[in-house]
Each structure stands twice: as structure tokens, then as C-alpha cells.
Amino acid sequence: MELEELGIREECGVFGCIAAGVWPTELDVPHVITLGLVGLQHRGQESAGIVTSDGESSQAFKVHKGMGLINHVFNADSLKKLYVSNLGIGHTRYSTSGISELQNCQPFVVETLHGKIAVAHNGELTNAVRLRRKLMRHGVGLSTSSDSELITQLLAFTPPLENDDTADWVARIKNLMNETPTSYSLLIMHKDIIYAVRDPYGNRPLCIGRLIPVGDINGKGKDNSETEGWVVSSESCSFLSIGAEYYREVLPGEIVKISRYDVQTLDVVPRPEGDPSAFCIFEYVYFARPDSIFEGQMVYSVRRRCGQQLAIEAPVEADLVSTVPESATPAALGYAQKCGLPYVEVLCKNRYVGRTFIQPNMRLRQLGVAKKFGVLSDNFKGKRVVIIDDSIVRGNTISPIIKLLRESGAKEVHIRVASPPIRFPCYMGINIPTKEELIANRPEFHDLANYIGADSVVYLSVEGLVSSVQESIKARKENENSLKTQKSRVGKIGHCTACLTGDYPVELEW
């Protein structure tokens, strides 16, 4: 909850679709992409865009972009611009490296020697400044402040040994991956192909789904053996609403070619020897939707395990467990289960108070929490309450909630946080306040309970978070018959905890 209030957000979601079989297809590709992006709306609310093609010509790209939410950017009229299409990619954005304006909207489209390419990017390059200078020294002009344009222009560069008559897109993609180690999950569209690419550290998520026939309302006539198309997405949560089933993840460093015929691995670019993968651990903590699947496990299950681990590390004498609706609910349920305490709702959320709500005066601004939440005082009056939250960033959001609960009759209010303190900015795709703004780096942190008005405050340890995330992964890998093959492809299990520990997976270049 606090993350949402304070602007700590994932900045992008990517989604692609390609129809299988005979073209022109009967599959409504633009509509599928739009619905896929709606499923990723939590990853970016500033702008959105879709690029489609009939696949017959590398020049026949149709583009529509706009500022705002998906349902504001795309309607019946704007979708008409994207027909007739057999494949396409889309993007929803929350800015980090580029300012929020239309020219930074993705996907980016550029003309190359071998036709147009469209690129959608989730992540943030750790060496963007150097790459920007390199391109400019080669006479390449840049029209936006987004580092995603750097990726597009680097792909347009002809790599060494490429014949002018044919484009070696795998060589171009590998050239890009050699130029920048992280952070990116990419969709690249050229003519009749979509390439799905994940950086060697696997910092940002990317997965593939298979579109299957919908059948009738009772499920009759549904043939799961038939493939109507392929989709690729930042999160698997976008698959159900479009009639797709989860197929698999794109592995760290993998270059996948998706065509109307099949899904094919073209190459896997390795990390430096000894380096573990570095999937962002905060995807599990907060950013992803709870029904998404990462590394073979559902996000909801991981959050619940975090709550159970928090109960082991930080038990407290109390009467009930609750949460601030609603991202920390799985952790709160896990905490309650482990402690043997009842889970009880103490707040109800006004869902119609959005991020863009205008605060006309100081009084209403100070009443922001009361405006957003209703109090279920009959559930906790005279009782000791444990509130589970996903994070405390600055401390000025949870404090009014504690005050509200006390004024409504809570005897005690204990705060338990289902993640460790955030101490460092991300620099790899998450918009986090400056180091000085984070409560964990300020003097108030040494007496945080008193500062926010709680009876006690305890965070989950870094070790506890990592073990909660990796427990299921390790157990599954131990049972896999193909363990040796799997290890050779993806290497050691690892997760990026840079915002918690300052230990970045690669050296940052500024």
C-alpha cells in the first residue's frame, strides 16, 4: 500500500501476439493485445501503445499511442487503425529514465536497412549514458529521453560481418546484449516475426502463452490441442482473460523467435561465469499481480510464505491480524495462519478514489486516509491489532492509518512489514525515491514505532525474504530429472536485492 502511495512502481509492461496458421487470420490481434495490456495495467498507467502488421511487408506497420490508461487510449475508432493485422506488440508505461510525454510512448519504430522494426522494452539500462554518447558519436540522433530508444537504435546498427543483402537479427540482438548487461525484457517485431528477449541476468519477467479455442459457454467444443496463436507478456496474469494458457518463461539470456508456425529458441547468451541470475525480488513482494507465475511458482504463494516467515521472526501478543487493503493480504493470511490468530478486516477501501484525485485544500489533503478507507470498528474495538504491510518507505502513509485505528478503538496497533527496509534506489527499472528520502536511512528509523505511532514495528529480514522466494524453486529443481541440463542453461538461483542491500548484480555506469 505504501509503495503505491509514494510512487514506487514498476514502469513498464510488454505484450505481443501473433496468429498461428493461415494468414490473413480471423483472430482479432489488436483486440487481443489491448486486453493483454489491460491485464498489465498495474505495471504502467502513464501511456500505452500498440504496433501491428499484416506480416507481408516490413513497411506495413500500423501504430497507435496515447497518454493515459488503456481504456482511454484504445477505443473502437483507434483500434480500426490497427487492422488488418496478423501480429503486433504493445506496451504500457510508467516512466523512469524518460519524462512522461507522448514522444516517449512505446513501442518505438525505426527504419533499418532491412525494413522497419518495432521495439517494446521493460527495464532500465545500467549503462544508458555511455550508450547514448556512443550513438551520438556515430551520428545517430535521438529524439526522446527514454533509454528504450537506445535499444531500438542499437538494433538498427549493422553488426560486424553482416551481409548488406540480408539481416542477421540474432547477431544484432546478441550485439545489443553484449553492449548492455541489464535490465531489459524486450519484444522486437520485424515483418512476420516477434523476437522475445530477456537480459542474461533475467532481471525483468517475460513469459509465453498459447492461444487456444474458446469453445462455447459450457466449455464444449474446446480443443486444447489446437493453437490459434502465441502471446508473450511481462506477466502470465494477462493470459486468462484472452483465452491463453501458460506455456513457459523466457529464460535469462534467451532469444526466442515466435512465428505463425512455432516458438523456437535461437540462442542463450550467458552471464559472466559465477554470476547468479538476478530476477527482481520486488516483483514477488509488490509489483506483480498475485495470480502471476514466476520461476514456476505463483506470486500469491510466495507472499503467503513471506507472511509465515514474518510470524516466525516477529511474533507478538495480539488478538487479531489484518492488513491495509489489499496487496499485503496474502502475507497477512500467512502471518495469521502461522501465529494461530484470526484474520479480520479492519479497513474497507473506497475503490473510486484514484491516483489522480484532486486535493483542493489542506484539510482534505490531511484527511486523505479517511477519504480512501472506511473503518470496520466493530471488528477490532478494544483489541490488540497486528497490521501487515508490504513496505514502509517514508513512514508518512502508515502513520495516519495507525491514528485512524486508535481513534476508532484499537487497544494496540503493531506493524509487521512483509519485506526488508528499502535503503537504496533501484536504477534497473523501478522508480524509487532518493536514498535520503527513504525512512530506513533517516534518524527516525531508530525509533520508527514512536515516529509512526505504533506499539511496535518489525520488518522481515533479507534472509527471510530470500528463503521464502527460493524455497519452492530449490525443492522443484532438486526433483527435476533434467537438473544438469537446467543448470547449464540458467545457472545458479539468484535474485536481485539491490534496493535492500546495495548489492547490484552489475556495476552501474553513470
UniProtKB/Swiss-Prot annotation:
Mg(2+) binds at S327, D389, D390. InterPro entries: GATase_2_dom, Ntn_hydrolases_N, PRibTrfase_dom, PRTase-like, PurF, PurF_N. The active site is at C12 (nucleophile). Binds 1 Mg(2+) ion per subunit. Its EC number is 2.4.2.14. It catalyses: 5-phospho-beta-D-ribosylamine + L-glutamate + diphosphate = 5-phospho-alpha-D-ribose 1-diphosphate + L-glutamine + H2O. Pathway: Purine metabolism; IMP biosynthesis via de novo pathway; N(1)-(5-phospho-D-ribosyl)glycinamide from 5-phospho-alpha-D-ribose 1-diphosphate: step 1/2. CDD domains: GPATase_N, PRTases_typeI. GO terms for cellular component: cytosol. One of its GO terms (molecular function) is 4 iron, 4 sulfur cluster binding. It comes from the Eukaryota. It is an enzyme of class 2 (transferase). Its cofactor is Mg(2+); [4Fe-4S] cluster. NCBIfam families: purF. Catalyzes the formation of phosphoribosylamine from phosphoribosylpyrophosphate (PRPP) and glutamine. In the C-terminal section; belongs to the purine/pyrimidine phosphoribosyltransferase family. This is Amidophosphoribosyltransferase. It comes from Gallus gallus. The gene is PPAT.
